[in-house]
Regions:
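Short hydrophobic/Thr-rich beta-strand motif most characteristic of the beta2 strand and flanking loop
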Residues: 25-32, 40
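Conserved acidic carboxylate
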Residues: 8
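Active-site residues of response regulator receiver
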Residues: 52
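Receiver (REC) domain active-site loop signature in two-component systems and cognate sites
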Residues: 55
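Charged docking surfaces used in two-component/phosphorelay signaling
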Residues: 15-23
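Alpha4 helix (beta4-alpha4-beta5 surface) of REC/receiver domains from two-component response regulators
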Residues: 62, 82-100, 107, 111-114
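Acidic catalytic/metal-coordinating carboxylates
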Residues: 33, 59-63
Length: 123
C-alpha cells in the first residue's frame, strides 16, 4: 500500500481516480490544485505524487518541484490532456516516472503507480 498525493482539478475525475486507487489498496489524499495540495505535501510523507499538469494556480510542474525539494526520490506521475505539455514536463522535472495522456485506462495508472513504487524500492 502506498500513500498517494493526488492533485487534479477536474471535479469528476478526481474522486473517481481517488476511489480507484483506494480500491487498489492505496491511501489517497486528493486536492483540486497545487495550491491546495502544497500544505499537505509539507505536513505529511507520501510515497508518490500524481498530478494533473495544467491546473488553476500552481500547476503540476511547480507542485512536483516542491515535492522533489522535500523528497528527491519521490516518484511523480503526471496526467494531462495536452501531449505537448507532457513532453515539456518530461524535460523540465527530474524524476518523472510516467506521463499519462487523458483519456487513459485506469489500469495504466495503477500499473504506473506499481512500477514507480518498485523502481523507488530498487534505488
Amino acid at each position: 500500500m502506498a500513500r498517494i498525493l493526488l492533485a487534479e482539478d477536474d471535479d469528476n475525475l478526481r474522486p473517481f481516480l481517488a476511489r480507484s486507487l483506494e480500491n487498489a489498496g492505496h491511501e489517497v489524499l486528493a486536492f483540486s490544485d497545487g495550491d491546495e495540495a502544497l500544505p499537505a505535501l509539507h505536513a505529511a510523507e507520501f510515497d508518490i505524487l500524481i498530478s494533473d499538469l495544467v491546473m488553476p494556480g500552481m500547476n503540476g510542474i511547480e507542485l512536483a518541484r516542491h515535492a522533489r525539494e522535500k523528497a528527491p526520490d519521490l516518484p511523480v506521475i503526471f496526467i494531462t490532456g495536452f501531449s505537448a505539455v507532457a513532453m515539456e514536463a518530461l524535460n523540465t522535472v527530474d524524476g518523472v516516472s510516467k506521463v499519462l495522456s487523458k483519456p487513459f485506462h485506469l489500469n495504466s495508472l495503477v500499473e504506473a503507480v506499481r512500477n514507480a513504487l518498485e523502481d523507488r524500492a530498487l534505488s
